[in-house]
């Protein structure tokens, strides 16, 4: 069991996302939360998982000098990839409405990369889930953005909220990845790292 392997290690989760924090709680993996500011800028030539891989590694760099032997740092990044464009978190109401409108009646990819960093080791994994949205009315989109304020969510929506319940007809891949973390992959990778 992973819990036994973790006895002599400390997991640092560099994420302010309450959803990611809850996943670790549900996985029964104790974590120390440490969020440090990073300027999330990436080159325009990067596509899909190249973007999230790059950003998840970038987020780890501010910790490199501080990591102790028994610590494992976990950093991650999620984007919604639609029509060859990466959608991050919307800046405001208008941008959230625009993002969701662009997803309405179509399918898109939600891509998450997770970077595991220890004193002498780094591994990056990524996972993609395809999400299919029904046609949404302008009123539905306005209602969602006004009442749920999805400004901390890639693509301007959360699958587990009202908009997901009424608008998502199917997904291909991990549901938990769309919420913010491919939990099965994280568990497996931590087990491999601690067993090696």
From Swiss-Prot:
Cofactor: a divalent metal cation
Organism: Christiangramia forsetii (strain DSM 17595 / CGMCC 1.15422 / KT0803) (Gramella forsetii)
Any one of the GO BP annotations: nucleotide metabolic process
Gene Ontology cellular component terms for the protein in this record: cytoplasm
Segments passing through the bilayer: none
Active site: 77 (proton acceptor)
Disulfide bonds: none
NCBIfam families: maf (TIGR00172)
Enzyme Commission number(s): 3.6.1.9
Keyword Cytoplasm attributed: yes
Alphabetical list of InterPro entries matching this protein: ITPase-like_fam, Maf-like
Protein name, per record: dTTP/UTP pyrophosphatase
Keywords: Cytoplasm, Hydrolase, Nucleotide metabolism
Its biological purpose: Nucleoside triphosphate pyrophosphatase that hydrolyzes dTTP and UTP. May have a dual role in cell division arrest and in preventing the incorporation of modified nucleotides into cellular nucleic acids.
Reactions accelerated catalytically: dTTP + H2O = dTMP + diphosphate + H(+); UTP + H2O = UMP + diphosphate + H(+)
An example molecular function term from Gene Ontology annotations: UTP diphosphatase activity
Pfam families: Maf
Keyword Cytoplasm: yes
Record family assignment: Belongs to the Maf family. YhdE subfamily.
Annotated site residue numbers, Important for substrate specificity: 19, 78, 160
Subcellular location: Cytoplasm
């Amino acid at each position: 069991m992973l819990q036994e392997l973790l006895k002599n290690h400390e997991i640092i989760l560099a994420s302010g996302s309450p959803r990611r924090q809850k996943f670790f709680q549900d996985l029964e993996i104790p974590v120390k939360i440490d969020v440090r500011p990073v300027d999330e800028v990436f080159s325009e030539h990067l596509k899909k998982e190249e973007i999230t891989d790059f950003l998840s590694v970038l987020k780890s760099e501010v910790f490199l000098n501080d990591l102790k032997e028994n610590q494992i740092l976990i950093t991650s990044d999620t984007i919604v990839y639609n029509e060859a464009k990466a959608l991050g978190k919307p800046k405001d109401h208008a941008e959230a409405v625009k993002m969701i409108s662009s997803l309405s009646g179509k399918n898109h990819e939600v891509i998450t990369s997770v970077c595991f960093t220890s004193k002498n080791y780094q591994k990056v994994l990524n996972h993609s889930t395809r999400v299919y949205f029904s046609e949404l009315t302008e009123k539905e989109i306005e209602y969602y953005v006004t009442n749920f304020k999805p400004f901390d969510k890639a693509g301007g929506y959360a699958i587990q909220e009202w908009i997901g319940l009424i608008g998502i007809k199917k997904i291909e891949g991990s549901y938990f990845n769309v919420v913010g973390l491919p939990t099965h992959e994280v568990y497996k990778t931590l087990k491999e790292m601690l067993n090696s």
